[in-house]
Amino acid sequence: GAVTPIGNNVETFWKNVKEGKNGIGSITKFDTTDYKVKIAAEVKDFSAKELMDFKAAKRMETFSQYAVAAAKDAGFNIEEEDPYRCGVIIGSGVGSLQQVEKACQTIETKGPGRVNLLLVPMMISNMAAGNVSIHFGLKGKSINVVTACATGTNCIGDALRAIQYGDAEVMFAGGTESCICPTAVAGFTALTALTTVQDPDRASIPFDKERGGFVLGEGAGVVVLEELEHAKARGAHIYAEIGGYGATCDAHHVT
C-alpha cells in the first residue's frame, strides 16, 4: 500500500509514476518567507476521516495516519488470520516534530500545564507501528525501526527475519514520514542537505552533475510479507520472494 505525493494508493501512484508526474511543489504547510528552501513533496488531498473514525484519526499524528492508510491499501484480509501470528515493523525517522513545535509554543504562551495530554503518544515514532497494530487487531510483534533514509528497507529486512525465525507468519513492513514543518526544513537546510533550487523539475536530480541536495517529502509505503507456504495455502497473489537480507554501515560520517 502507498500514500505518496503523486497518489494516495498504489494504483494512482503507479499510474502517475509511469506518466512521469512530479509531486514536488511549493510548501503549503507553513509560511516559507524567511526560508531558503521553499519546495517539498507534500501529500495532497489526504483525508484520514475516510479511512477511520473521527476519534481515532484525532488521536493520531499525520505520519501514523499515513501508515494506517498504506497498510489498509495493501489489501490484506486479516479476519481469517491468527492475530498472534501477525505483526508490524513500520519505521519513521522522525515521528512528529509538529507535536514538539506545538508543545514548545504552548509552554511559552500558556505554560507547561496546557500541553496536549496526547503529546507523547502522538509524537513518538513507534506509534506508526502501534496504530497499525491497533487498527487491524494485530497481536504479534509491533516494532519501530529508526535508521534515517534506510528505515523502510531495514523494516522489511527485520520483518523477513521475524518470519524466518518463526515469530510470525504475516508481517506488515515499511516506513512512514510526515515532517514538512519549520523545524525539519530549517534543520536539514542548516545541514546543507536540501536543494535550494526552486524549479520542481530541476530540484531532485540525484544523478546529475548539477545536483545540490535532496527534496524533503512525506508519505508511507507498506508491504505484506508472508511465510511462503502460508501464502500458497490461502491462494495469495505473490508479487516477489525475498531471498535474504543484510545490513552494514561505513562507520565514517553522520550522513
PLM segments and residue spans:
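Conserved beta-ketoacyl condensing-enzyme motif
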Residues: T12-W14, K18-T147, T176-V185
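Active-site-proximal alpha-helical scaffold in enzymes
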Residues: A67-N77, S125-E177, V215-A236
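Active-site pocket-shaping loop/turn-to-helix segments
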Residues: A2-N8, F54-K72, V115-I124, S142-G157, ...
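Condensing-enzyme catalytic core mediating Claisen C-C bond formation in acyl metabolism
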Residues: K18-G25, D199-T255
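Short glycine-aspartate micro-motif
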Residues: R85-I89, E169-A173, S204, Y239
